[in-house]
Amino acid sequence: GDIAFAQKFSTMNIVQSATAKSAETHAGRSDFATLGTTIAQDATSQQTALTTLVAPHAIALPTTAPKEDQMLIKRLKALHGPAFDRLYIRYLAREITLMKPVLDAEILASSNTDLVKLAKNTNAKLSAYQEQIQ
């Protein structure tokens, strides 16, 4: 339901924001650095929108990345150039593959039009990121 979606979506924003900030400075390819800037901005605005939407419903959103994601964030911070790019592409491709069905399910099942709109917008952004890393 909406609560589970909001929590997964929040986690995605936290992790995408952290990894994208590393991409801005550690990426070997300049297009990945630029993509990092875009993703960091998107994740921040998505999180702001989500926080606003769930505020009246007393839904607790995660504020930190899960342990396995924290390890990934740490590894990315330690890498530079092509090594960074390889791991970042792998992470982003996996993240998109995992999140698309979550977003699709929310779009189909939710009666909250604002959450549906947010899910649709995010889905479009993930598709755009996917094209850039192929």
Language-model segment annotations:
Residues 1-134:
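His/Met- and acidic-residue-enriched segments that coordinate or traffic transition-metal cofactors
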